[in-house]
Amino acid sequence: MMAMKPIKGAVNRRFRPSSYRKNDSLAKETIIAYLEDNGHTILDSEENYSFDIKSEKNGNIYYSEVEMKNQWKGDWNTSWKEIRIPYRKHKLINKFEEVKADNTFLNFYVIRGDCKQAWRIKDTLLEKSEVKEAQGFRIEPGEHFFHIPYEEAILVELEDGLRNAS
């Protein structure tokens, strides 16, 4: 695959330290617990502005990127026809291409606000998804997203969630 390029004229949401502090460790802890429950050994989850989590299972290496969707409460709202992942994450797909081998995988997890479910989106699905501008209450004008039809993603059940721990 050719490297994904920035979109001319597109904007990225400003970094919000308070949102990061509230969501990053919770999202990582939630998916680390899920991965460990499914036989993964966690190799790295330190903040390094790269993949959120690196794990190993059965000789395969998995890279995971995690994101909270606090607006998602209860069952998925089927009027939300797609899951949106910020296009700025294309940098991770490019980085993954540098380390990609037959036994490496990249998954994006979009986690429900109470941490009881998540959508798992494989890099191959993300790569073929439509990229376009989106509108919404928290979306900056000009910000682009991958638009993934939710029916094509994998809904995973997360034990009891971790929200009650915070």
Predicted regions and their residues:
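Catalytic cores of nucleic-acid endonucleases
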Residues: A10-S18, S25, E29, D37-N38, ...
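Charged, low-complexity intrinsically disordered tails and linkers
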Residues: M1-K8
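N-terminal cationic leader/targeting segments used for protein routing and processing
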Residues: N58-I61, H90, A165
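Short secondary-structure boundary/capping segments within folded domains
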Residues: L43-E46, K54-E56
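Non-catalytic C-terminal interaction segments of nucleic acid-processing enzymes
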Residues: D37, D102-F105, V110-S166
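Conserved catalytic cores of phosphodiester-cleaving nucleases, focusing on short active-site segments
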Residues: L35, I53-G74
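Beta-rich catalytic cores
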Residues: Y49
